């Protein structure tokens, strides 16, 4: 029997039920439930359906004049009635996703302490490092299956937001549920409060975090280790998603734990998976392969290099050598093109640095090879921005790229919209509508020469909810690179452009449930093949995916004794 059709037996009554967001129905409690649970008189007389409630909530939502107020309003509903919150978001997913996550969540993080209203998730502060087990036991969520955790140091493109970074785990888990069907009862947002180096926060009398410079070195590593061990004592099978850790910590943490626990880093691996999936769709629509492309990155941090490594892996899977694949990928950061003779390259950058012997014949060659120089000499067919610096894809650069590539693929992926390398409107006008554009944050359609171009949002929300659903459905104990590659290929299979050569690069958000299920199946199949999950039939796997998919519907309640 479907869980939503089974009655749920509750041992408490009265106002306590109305204060429990996972249980509260508000005006939808039936007459029988109001009597049995001592709710008569605590609610208006009318008994409403969830759709009637959602209609009222939507009218209230539309009454707010700015996106931050809309975000706060939706969070208030989430903190009082989660089922209604997810029905409202499900009914209006394209309109509300930019409100509950990027770009609005960035402003919510910046103003987190100022706008704080009600607790959600767990804050684990460094001064409490010896009581992590007790803190985890304080959570009201006892069946946690997915955790999103941040230390708040690199929030989107906004930098160190301290505990204000909690807005990111809350928002990401909201998307796990609204896009991937993960029950909110199985999710837990966590912020690791290890101090902040943001002087504005340290001086802000309203800041609610630990007022101390960020810890680092061994202290930091030992704290992360204590957290990971405590989490797996409490919930041994949990999936952990690392979110918005600084570059200096993100890759080392991932490398340390990816083979010990079921975990992944969304900034590195999720961004890579959705970008590769989008590139595969674009290549399929053009009748080419990813291994045919020449790809330039602006931004050579952990996210950019993570995408580049995923692209190299996909190119190799298409039949070219690793060396050949790497020779077709050009990484540019603030110091110019990464070259193998540069000192102080980070370990994850070294394998992606171009051999200086391969490029010293370029026109205008110098020790600092600019992005424009790379475009003029390497003649890339794909340009990807993950720099977090706005406006760096200039008209000169885009026109230079278009001069040697009839249909350039341009992905300015930096978040939020204020940090984007170039707007879709500018890119399409500079290329007379010929560029294929995808962005990290949502943008309105662009009209060029009376033709309307929908802008694909190359957002991780197309990927990580399906990964989570697949892990839960098959009981995987790891998230491998091959599972992530499978998610990319599954996303490309959902592309309207790849299917028939027309339409948007990525499917509309209204189809996100089907996309997540398709990705979940592909991810789970690879997990089983690799021995990360128990073997099962395709039919039973699909049944498990459906059984794990939660829909925002009210359940019947029955009273049981204390």
Swiss-Prot record:
Its EC number is 1.1.1.38. Divalent metal cations. Prefers magnesium or manganese. Its cofactor is Mg(2+); Mn(2+). This is NAD-dependent malic enzyme. GO terms for cellular component: cytosol. It comes from Shewanella amazonensis (strain ATCC BAA-1098 / SB2B). The keyword Metal-binding applies. It is an enzyme of class 1 (oxidoreductase). GO terms for molecular function: malate dehydrogenase (decarboxylating) (NAD+) activity; metal ion binding; NAD binding; oxaloacetate decarboxylase activity. The active site is at residues 101, 172. InterPro entries: Aminoacid_DH-like_N_sf (IPR046346), Malic_enzyme_CS (IPR015884), Malic_N_dom (IPR012301), Malic_N_dom_sf (IPR037062), Malic_NAD-bd (IPR012302), Malic_OxRdtase (IPR001891), NAD(P)-bd_dom_sf (IPR036291), NAD_malic_enz_proteobac (IPR023667). A divalent metal cation binds at residues 243-244, 267. NAD(+) binds at residues 154, 267, 415. Homotetramer. Belongs to the malic enzymes family. One of its GO terms (biological process) is malate metabolic process. The keyword NAD applies. SUPFAM superfamilies: Aminoacid dehydrogenase-like, N-terminal domain, NAD(P)-binding Rossmann-fold domains. Keywords: Metal-binding, NAD, Oxidoreductase. The record marks 267 as: Important for activity. It catalyses: (S)-malate + NAD(+) = pyruvate + CO2 + NADH; oxaloacetate + H(+) = pyruvate + CO2.
């Amino acid at each position: 029997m479907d869980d939503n059709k089974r009655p749920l037996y509750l041992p408490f009554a009265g106002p306590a039920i109305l204060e429990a967001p996972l249980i509260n129905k508000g005006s939808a409690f039936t007459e029988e439930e109001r009597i049995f649970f001592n709710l008569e008189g605590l609610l208006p007389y009318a008994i409403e359906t969830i759709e009637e409630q959602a209609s009222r909530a939507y009218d209230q939502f539309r009454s707010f004049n700015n996106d931050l107020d809309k975000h706060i309003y939706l969070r208030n509903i989430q903190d009082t009635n989660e089922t209604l919150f997810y029905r409202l978001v499900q009914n209006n997913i394209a309109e509300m996703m930019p409100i509950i996550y990027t770009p609005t969540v960035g402003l919510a993080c910046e103003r987190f302490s100022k706008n704080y209203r009600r607790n959600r998730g767990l804050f684990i502060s460094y001064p409490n490092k010896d009581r992590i087990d007790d803190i985890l036991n304080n959570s009201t969520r006892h069946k946690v299956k997915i955790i999103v955790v941040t230390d708040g140091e690199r929030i989107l493109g906004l930098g160190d937001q301290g505990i204000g970074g909690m807005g990111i785990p809350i928002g990401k888990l909201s998307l796990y549920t609204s896009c991937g069907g993960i029950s909110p009862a199985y999710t837990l947002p966590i912020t690791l409060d290890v101090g902040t180096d943001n002087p504005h926060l340290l001086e802000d009398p309203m800041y609610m975090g630990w007022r101390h410079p960020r810890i680092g070195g061994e202290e930091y590593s030992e704290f992360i280790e204590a957290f990971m061990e405590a989490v797996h004592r409490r919930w041994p099978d949990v999936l952990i998603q690392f979110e918005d850790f600084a570059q200096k910590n993100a890759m080392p943490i991932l490398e340390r734990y990816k083979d010990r626990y079921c975990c992944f880093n969304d900034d590195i691996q999720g961004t890579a998976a959705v970008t590769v999936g989008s590139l595969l769709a674009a290549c399929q629509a053009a009748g080419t392969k990813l291994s045919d492309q020449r790809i330039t990155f602006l931004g050579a941090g952990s996210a950019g290099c993570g995408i580049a490594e995923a692209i190299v892996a996909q190119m190799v899977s298409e039949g070219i050598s690793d060396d050949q694949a790497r020779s077709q990928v050009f990484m540019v950061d603030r110091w110019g093109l990464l070259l193998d003779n540069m000192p102080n390259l980070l370990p994850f950058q070294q394998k992606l640095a171009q051999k200086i012997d391969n490029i010293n014949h370029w026109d205008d060659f110098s020790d600092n090879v600019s992005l424009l120089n790379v475009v003029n000499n390497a003649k890339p067919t794909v340009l990807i921005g993950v720099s977090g610096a706005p406006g760096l894809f200039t008209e000169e650069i885009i026109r230079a790229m278009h001069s040697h590539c009839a249909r350039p693929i341009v992905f300015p992926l930096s978040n939020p919209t204020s940090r984007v390398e170039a707007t879709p409107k500018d890119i399409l006008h500079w290329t007379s509508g010929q560029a294929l554009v995808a962005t990290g944050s949502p943008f309105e359609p662009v009209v060029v020469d009376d033709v309307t171009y929908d802008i694909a949002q190359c957002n991780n929300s197309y990927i990580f909810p399906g990964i989570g659903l697949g892990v839960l459905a098959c009981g995987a104990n790891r998230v491998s690179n091959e599972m992530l590659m499978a998610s990319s290929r599954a996303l490309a299979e959902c592309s309207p452009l790849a299917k028939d050569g027309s339409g948007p690069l990525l499917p509309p958000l209204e189809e996100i449930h089907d996309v997540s299920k398709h990705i979940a199946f592909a991810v789970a199949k690879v997990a089983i093949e690799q021995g990360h999950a128990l073997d099962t039939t395709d039919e039973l796997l699909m049944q498990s995916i459906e059984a794990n998919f939660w829909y925002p519907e009210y359940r019947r309640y029955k009273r049981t004794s204390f």
